[in-house]
Amino acid sequence: MQNIGFAAGSLIKGRWTVVKKIGQGAFGEIFSGKNIINNEQIAIKVEKVDTKKQVLRLEVAVLKKLQLCPYVCRFITCGRHNDYNYMVMELLGENLSELRRKQLDGKFSLGSTLKLGVQMIQSLQAVHDLGYLHRDVKPSNFAIGLNPSKRNITYLIDFGLARRFVLASGEVRPARESTGFRGTARYASINSHLSKDLGRRDDLWSIFYVLIEFAEGQLPWRKLKDKDQIGEMKQKYNTPDLVKDLPPQFSQFMKHLKSLNYEDRPNYVFLQTLLNDCYTSLGLSESTPFDWEVQTNSGASSSSSNTTQQQQQQQQQQQQRNLNQSGLNNSSARLMASPSTIDVEASGKSTQLNNSNNNNNNNNKGLGAENDSSPQPQIIRRNSESNSQIANSSESDNKGSGGGSWNQKSSSPRHKDKNLQDDGGEGSQKHLKASNNNNINNNNNNYNNNNNNNNNSHMNGNGSNSQPIDKIELSHQQQKSSTTKCCSTSKCSVM
């Protein structure tokens, strides 16, 4: 695409200043920036208003609904500036693709791979429970926090290819006979290569491929460029041999995914428990750092640093080999994936999501998994997913392109949503406390009940407002009144 041309030093709405371009995609560009009022570092995503395929509106809609999930980046504001639509969000650190390439042999230790897997599954479950598919799951669409206290948190980003997979009634949309390819060839599911309509299982197939690459440093089709050839090789390796050098939990993970049909809801708890059991069987604990968190003396040489990391990886690899030889017993021990506190900031303010890990009666003892000492995969096959379990709002058909202009003259209900208007950066984040005292199922029920009573306020709007997107501010009372939860994890409960 052509360079959008946001110059360094440009000022947006008298508050956000552009620093430099940090990324570019098919439909827009991303810049780092700064809030000139409080010096907060931000990211600004922009697209031209006359872009044929506008995706920013959809991304804003999804991101705003996920703001209570600890594994989704913080949304700040959105609007129009001159001939551009823009979205301001929290600036994050390196993505997982960059971090992996910095590791020895280009791979993560097994322990880090498993911890990452649990966080990624939890973030995808939150998206799915809102009724959306991500459809472009890959390492570069997960990034760690920029703040040192958040470098152990993985955030899901880039919802430009997201698609709503449920109807207003809560039923899963009928599968289309044929669709175009969606995603990134290396990590896309076989169904995507076959031009089949994608479901929740396909996002998890992408997670599966990502985890293999994290643990082994490569995928068998890494050298191929043609997506059709990649698809053929994926079908060839669609057997347990693909994970023969990994712990047996990976083959169980694969077996569950292969059992799912288009409309089925994956057993997220079962998948998290598999990874959690493998993690605890390695003798690792909650305090075990990610590979990139390993501390080295500032004066130590590069070779000394490499030796330390190499010893750590060799130790974990030896543990892995021992486990492969002897097999693993299911463990009831669980490890909490999130840190004890997670900062959530909004417009220069901050609060704490208190995730207490010391409650002996807490049913969520795993990396987000339920306390089930002998988990069995459960598959729900039905076209109706119950209105209380999937998203709440009535949606027009979304083809994955984000469709439509931010101009309020559009006839699509989605384009008249008052919640997508520019709020000037104030009050876009709800200050709520997360409780860790409810198990995952209770959280699902509470979240869904809230959704059903929310009158579809997040996405539908009343369609009566014809003002431009950057002229309408959300009142504090409007924002304060919404307590819809974004996901079913214990960390996202609303007190």
From Swiss-Prot:
Residues 295-333, 354-364, 435-466 have a biased composition (Low complexity). The keyword Nucleotide-binding applies. Residues 293-469 are annotated as: Disordered. SUPFAM superfamilies: Protein kinase-like (PK-like). Residues 385-395 have a biased composition (Polar residues). The active site is at D136. GO terms for molecular function: ATP binding; protein serine/threonine kinase activity. Residues 16-275 form the Protein kinase domain. Belongs to the protein kinase superfamily. CK1 Ser/Thr protein kinase family. This is Probable serine/threonine-protein kinase DDB_G0292354. It comes from Dictyostelium discoideum (Social amoeba).
